[in-house]
C-alpha cells in the first residue's frame, strides 16, 4: 500500500466494503437490534433500518461501516458507506472510502453503483438488470450475468447461494460457503476461495459482525457501533 513516510502494514480488508477478491458461486449489538425495522421485499423477515459497525484492527478503531435501508413498496434500496483512515505518527498513511448502492425489487437486483477511493485512486462500477440477465460494468470489464446474480454484500446472507460478483470491480466470484449454527439460533457464514472472511447473524438474520484478513495478514473486525 503506497503511503507517505513510513509504510505501515496494510490496514484495509483484502476486499472493500466488505466484498471478496476476484474469482460463480458455491455453495453495540443492542443498538443494531433496537433500530426501526423494515420488511424485506420478497419475504416477511424484518431488518433494522440501519446497521452501523466500527472497523477494528489490532485493537484500534480505524473506521466505520454503515448500511442504510429505504423501502418504497416492493423496492428496497441499501446504501453502504465505508470510511477507513490509518495514521502513523500523526500522518495519514492510508485512506479508504467506498460508497455502494443497490436497489432490489422483490428478490431480484434492479441496479447497483459503486465508487471506491483508495488513497486517491478511484474505481467505479455500474450494474443493471435487463430481461433475463444482470449487466455489470466495472474496472475488471463487462460481464453478462444470470438474472439472479447479486453483488457480494454481507448484510443479507440469503444471497450467498446466488451467482455473486465483486461489489467494486464487478468480477464474478467463485467462493465456497459453509454455515455453522451459533448458540441462541444465530449463524456464522464462512467464505473461502479467494479470501478468508466470515459473517455472524442473529436468529432473525440480522447481520451482527464480520471478520477478515487484511492484506498484511492482520485481522480486521466489524463490531456493532
Residue ranges with predicted function:
Residues 1-27, 41:
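N-terminal secretory signal peptides
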Residues 17, 23, 27, 31-32, ...:
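Small/flexible residues
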Residues 22-48:
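N-terminal twin-arginine translocation
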Residues 31-34, 54-64, 135-137, 160:
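Short, charge-rich amphipathic segments
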Residues 43-44, 96, 223-225:
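Surface-exposed flexible segments
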Residues 48, 106, 110-224:
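Solvent-exposed helix/loop surface patches that form functional interfaces
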Residues 49-51, 55-129, 205:
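N-terminal mature ectodomain segment of secretory-pathway/periplasmic proteins
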